Amino acid sequence: MKSKNKRVLILGGSSDIGIEVVKDFLNMNWDVTAHYFKNKKKLKKLKNKKLKLIHANFMKFNEKNTEKIISKKFSKKYDALINLVGYVDNKSFENTNLRSIIKTVKINALIPFLIEKKIVNKMLKQEWGRILNCSSIGVKFGGGKNSYNYGLSKHCLEFIPNRYKDWANKNVLINNIRIGVTRTKIHKRMKKNLQLKHRLKLIPAKRMAKPQEISSYIVNLVLDKNSFMTGETITVAGGE
């Protein structure tokens, strides 16, 4: 597959990792649609004619408007879909409640699932597509001290429908990537946190990943370089 005129949708495109993924695809001459909730300025600074921005607040999606919004905003054909949405509410297991759990799972997993459901049908018709859901190494540890809801939502996100086996016959592949501790705004604020210092000791390289490093793994999993792997969860966490 040649990258010319190929289209990718990146959910959570204004995140630190998302920005790097956007830049990597633009450098390969892909048409990039980047979804964002906040941080529009970071995306606009890229100033590229091949970059289109879509604003959507997943918190405002409900049973009445979800299908309508998805049809309006996410109805185009895409060759690749990458979900980097990552809402964190800083809730511990002890302090969580039904409302906060539902909110986090809806934003990080349920709405992205429904968007994927819409887009995968068009991928099947064109007989080519790549879907990658970006999860967290926190799933492995039952979530962090103050990120229980986030970890739970990412655990839900890793649930791949068994239809992926049929999709492979149409060259549509779907995978998850568990991302480890990365030098993003959230972890920068936690730098002095004792829990984070302990986690860095568990990583052989004794450091956080760079967003650019994570982006390279993400990009490779949705290019035609990956012509075989599907239904898998790949961990990129530096050995933690």
Feature names for model-found ranges:
Residues S92-F93, S100-V105, R199:
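Substrate-binding pocket helix/loop in short-chain dehydrogenase/reductase
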Residues T230-E240:
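Short C-terminal tail/terminal secondary-structure segment
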Residues I203-I214:
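A conserved structural motif in NAD(P)-dependent oxidoreductases
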Residues R130-C156, P161-A168, V181:
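Catalytic loop of short-chain dehydrogenase/reductase
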Residues N171-L173, M229-G231:
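Short, small/polar-rich loop/turn modules that mediate ligand/substrate recognition or access, typified
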Residues S14, V22:
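N-terminal Rossmann NAD(P)H-binding glycine-rich loop of SDR-like oxidoreductase domains
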